[in-house]
C-alpha cells in the first residue's frame, strides 16, 4: 500500500553513517567553494552576492570549456575529427549556459548596482585569464591582451603558451592540408602569435568542401561545428554588451575601458573568417539525375 503523502522512507541501503567516508561535500570541496563568495560592501549589499556568483559560475564553465577545446585540438592534431564532434556537442551546451545566465544578472537594476559598484575597485571582466585563454584557443591573438597578467607569472606563462601555439582553427587548416586540400603554406606554418589573416585560397578550399559535402563529410561537419561555436560565442558577447548597457548605460568600465563601446567592437571580431566568407561564394549544385 502507498505510504502517507509527502513522505518518502529512506531505503535500507542508503549510507547515513559517513564517518571516515568520502562525502559529497568532501568530493566537491564545498567548504572551499562556498566560502569563496566574500562580499566587500559595508554593510553587505543584498545584490552583491548575485554579482559574485554570476561571475564565479562563469569562470567554472569557462574552465570546462578550456578543457573541452583542448581535447578538440588534440583530436584534430591526430586527424581524428569524428571524436571531436561529441565534444563540440558538449561545448554547445556549455556556451548556452554561459550566455543564458546573463538573464540572471539582468535582474540587477542600475540603482542597486551603483550601491556597491565602488567595491569592485579596478577589477574587470577584461582581466579574466580564462576568458583570454578561450579567445586564444579559438584564434583571437592580441599581444596586448597579455599585459594585465604580467604580475602573475604562472598565469602569464600559461597564456603565453596558448598565445604562441596554433589555435583550433589553425590546427583544422593543418589537418586539411595533410588530407590533401590545397591550403596555402602561409597558413600551415606561420608565426602563431600574429593575428590571423584570411586568405582567398582558404575560402576556395572551403568552397570545394561545401560544394561536395558527401565526399568531404568529416571536414564539412567540422566546418559547421566551428560556425556553430563562433555564433554562440557572438551571442555571449552580445548578451554581455546588452547586460552592461542595461545596468550601467554608457558609463566607463571599472577597468578603465569605454564600457559598452569597447564591448561593441568585439562583435566585429571573427575567429573563422573564411567559413563566413565562403557562404557568399557558394552556388547552386548541378541538377541531380533522377531515374
From Swiss-Prot:
Protein name (database record): Tryptophan 2,3-dioxygenase
Binding site for substrate: 51-55, 113, 117, 254
Cofactor note as given: Binds 1 heme group per subunit.
Native species: Myxococcus xanthus (strain DK1622)
Cited function: Heme-dependent dioxygenase that catalyzes the oxidative cleavage of the L-tryptophan (L-Trp) pyrrole ring and converts L-tryptophan to N-formyl-L-kynurenine. Catalyzes the oxidative cleavage of the indole moiety.
Catalytic activity: L-tryptophan + O2 = N-formyl-L-kynurenine
Family label: Belongs to the tryptophan 2,3-dioxygenase family.
Residue numbers binding heme: 240
HAMAP family xref list: T23O
UniProt keyword terms in alphabetical order: Dioxygenase, Heme, Iron, Metal-binding, Oxidoreductase, Tryptophan catabolism
A biological-process GO annotation: L-tryptophan catabolic process to acetyl-CoA
Subunit structure, interactors included: Homotetramer.
Broad class of enzyme this protein falls into: oxidoreductase
Molecular-function GO terms, alphabetical: heme binding; metal ion binding; tryptophan 2,3-dioxygenase activity
CC cofactor: heme
Listed EC numbers: 1.13.11.11
Lineage top rank: taxon: Bacteria
Pathway: Amino-acid degradation; L-tryptophan degradation via kynurenine pathway; L-kynurenine from L-tryptophan: step 1/2
